[in-house]
Amino acid sequence: MTRNVRVDDPTAEEATALARALATRFGERVRVFTADGDEPVAESDPAEGDVSGRPDVDAEADAGPTEREERLWDEIEDILEGGPEKYRERQREAGKLFVRDRLDLWFEGLTFEDGKFANFDAWHPNAPGTDDESEGGNGGDGDRLPADGLLTGAATFEGRAVHVAANDYTVKAGSMARHGVEKLLRLQSRALDNGKPVLYLVDSSGGRIDQQTGFFANREGIGRVYYNHSMLSGRVPQICVLYGPCIAGAAYTPVFADFTIMVEGSAMAIASPRMVEMVTGEEITMDELGGPTVHAAESGSADLVADDEREARDLAARLLSYLPDSADADPPRTEGAPPANSPDGIDSVVPEAPRKGYDVRDLIDRIVDADSTLELKPAYGAEIVTAFARLDGRPVGVVANQPAKRAGAIFPDAAEKAAEFVWTCDAYGIPLLYLCDTPGFMAGSGVEKEGILEKGKKMIYAAASATVPKQCVVVRKAYGAGIYAMSGPAYDPESTLALPGGEIAIMGPEAAINAVHARKLAAIDDPDERAREEERLREEYRRDVDVHRMASEVVIDEIVPPSTLRDELVSRFDFYATTEKDLPGKKHGTII
């Protein structure tokens, strides 16, 4: 087998040295080419020890690596083994991959790795000042600290250059200390400078408590990691995957990342179950405290849940496919595809009766490209669907009321979920498609205590502040402040479209009639006559709020035949793709 390597303009000596070193390392023939050359400038075959491409080579002098280089290779091989074998075995028993096997699953080799020798002096027998006969800096296998428990570097993922940070759980349970923190800070700083996405493969028990003096509160300590997360937010995509229980400091990276994927069996919490019991007396398991179900359905901290490590990788790949390398780049467009189901059926999917439920995902499937939808946080705030999808290959963020859940009324969790999704799409230049079919924000003492006004405000603020192209479609009902939250006419969408059954009103007919005509109706003794009068008032109200009236008053831009909705949206997103908007000059708003 022959391995070919391309290098930008190497000298003859550099090419020869590289060929020889790689041939020795990989145990196969290596040919080195210039970046655009057709013929190799150097070759090396480890079996025969021959080197070509360098004039007048002394075969004996250049027979292979020196003893010094061999010693270095031995040290590297030792580092690559990770922590003690017993901890690698525990990883296997837990159904988890060793971190370097995990990287093999994700990438065809790292482009490069930084900091393999981090904390080398503290454990390796070859370290300066260490007795060669000892097993480590402190004399035991359990003291192995290869790479200080954190791997950092760069790789190509699905054709994209990315930064990678991955905890090695075989090293002190993936805990973080001074050198690992330094590596992570450097990676984040470089990502901020060069504008490439960051993948965090997190499997960490948090900070090393016995070493906190060196990294906890320092200006360049672990606190700076979250500062850097904040600076990277909205600048380059940050995707985090959780593989095991992540406690305290380790649990902040997932929530700071733009997107978090939890593998079944993982967990994250501000404190361990033991600490929780000590502080509160509550006895609880790690899964009950912060497992995937908790964060996917109750806290909203997890965007996606994967059954296993391979699915986690596939979900991350799908996520990245919608995202640009940085806020300065355009989201990647692909070749378009027809929808999974024909747009001709849109009108039959949406019931004529305003209060009848249906699954809005059936509507989405007739609008967007087939197999292009990735719903985020599906179990959290399920009254609103937030999803990435493609329209003729263009990535879009879909925000859709879900009449199949609580009639599509907007509850606090759903409002917060939608606000965060809109904010993220806007940060990375992803256009927004709103599909509005809601009776408005939910009312009642329960939702008031849960912050419906505060969280509803965030959703409205996000719609108002988003400067990416927006299209609002009034699918059926748009009542109350729901039309504001769904980026209606007052919120500067490029277009407000409506299907023929749409209604825009302060409230629904029943509520309006009760508010305005309650006494008049109560004065009618005959039940049949009262019912007829209610129906008359209802129809009169409906005519007043019917979408045709709104189109006549130019409140909306167009009533669209349902079967043409997809084509209409494709054309409008194409036309407005280069739209630029500026917010008023200010440091930032006060709403978060």
Where are the regions that the model predicts?
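A short, charged, amphipathic alpha-helix used as a generic interaction element across diverse proteins
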Residues: 12-25
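A short amphipathic beta-strand at an alpha->beta junction
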Residues: 27-37
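Long, folded non-catalytic interaction modules
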Residues: 38-44
